[in-house]
Amino acid sequence: MLTLHLQDDDVAAIDAVADELSRRYDSVESTEFQAESRLYADELPRRVRRALHEYRSTEKSGILVVTGLPVDDSALGATPADRRHKPVPSTSLRQDIAFYLIANLLGDPIGWATQQDGFIMHDVYPVQGFEHEQIGWGSEETLTWHTEDAFHPLRTDYLGLMCLRNPDGVETTACDIADVEIDDETRETLSQERFRILPDDAHRIHGKAPGDESARESALRERSRQRVASALESPDPVAVLFGDRDDPYLRIDPHYMQGVQGETEQRALETIGAAIDDAMSGVVLSPGDIVFIDNYRVVHGRKPFRARFDGTDRWLRRLNIARDLRKSREARLAATTRVIY
């Protein structure tokens, strides 16, 4: 795990850029903001840019924690209780901008039409009625470790989580495939395209389509829903391990791989699952901390906790970050848009 501790002058420089942009934009969902964000990311301190560049290019570790950004708890207001809560401007606008710009040093933040109503900036907080679900709104059940959006060929390269509030010290669990030891036979099996992954529940909760969307957007949205339905009905077989044999990437989501494997495949999954459990570590994020997770190297999850639903619960912001937007061009409305259908 790599750590970047922001110094006072780093924070001052980031704040100056965030202040300027927060006067011009009231949301990071603005396409104009997204178009300019890369330019402003280049104005972040060289020390910050170097740390993110080295993390991206060297792959020395799949986890990078950035600490030191300020968060005024009183200015945030209550932790939202409803997943549709999206005020404009956000009470965390300055933090959102800083988070977005730092994420831009890894790639382009993206959203999903089938997840959180197509927003780029996601929320992670407990919602009543979802306590036992395997999604970001859950709380009382362990969020089983997984690759983010493992079922999807356009899954994110990096996942970013920024902590706004974590009064109970809830741990984000993580494990780098480089730390996992398995036998050669299991490795060989896992490297073959024999494993099926179902779409996770977050992609099955579809928001309401806007009434004024274009015919092309409607067509893309319907195709996206059909893809999820098809993946539920008959998921394509994929390899769990891929890339370099001795230093592989991985793609796995055990909770959504149960009951759809053959006996040999299931044994291989159980073997690597036990090895990942043995190598599992984690990080407890404090307000202002950001953790970046290489989604090709690291599985992540969350320890269980009991939510109070009183406005003081754990609250994170989340970004999915793509290294190459062109891979998803056929699934986006335009070259300038960031939502994948």
UniProtKB/Swiss-Prot annotation:
One of its GO terms (biological process) is antibiotic biosynthetic process. Its EC number is 1.14.11.40. Pathway: Antibiotic biosynthesis. Pfam families: TauD. Binds 1 Fe(2+) ion per subunit. It catalyses: L-enduracididine + 2-oxoglutarate + O2 = (3S)-3-hydroxy-L-enduracididine + succinate + CO2. Its cofactor is Fe(2+). Fe cation binds at residues 146, 148, 300. Residues 203-223 are annotated as: Disordered. InterPro entries: Alpha-KG_dependent_hydroxylase, AlphaKG_dependent_hydroxylases, Clavaminate_syn-like, TauD-like_sf, TauD/TfdA-like. Disruption phenotype: Cells produce dideoxy-mannopeptimycins. One of its GO terms (molecular function) is oxidoreductase activity. NCBIfam families: GntD_guanitoxin. Hydroxylates the beta carbon of free L-enduracididine to produce (3S)-3-hydroxy-L-enduracididine in biosynthesis of the nonproteinogenic amino acid beta-hydroxyenduracididine, a component of antibiotic mannopeptimycin. Belongs to the clavaminate synthase family. This is Enduracididine beta-hydroxylase. The gene is mppO.
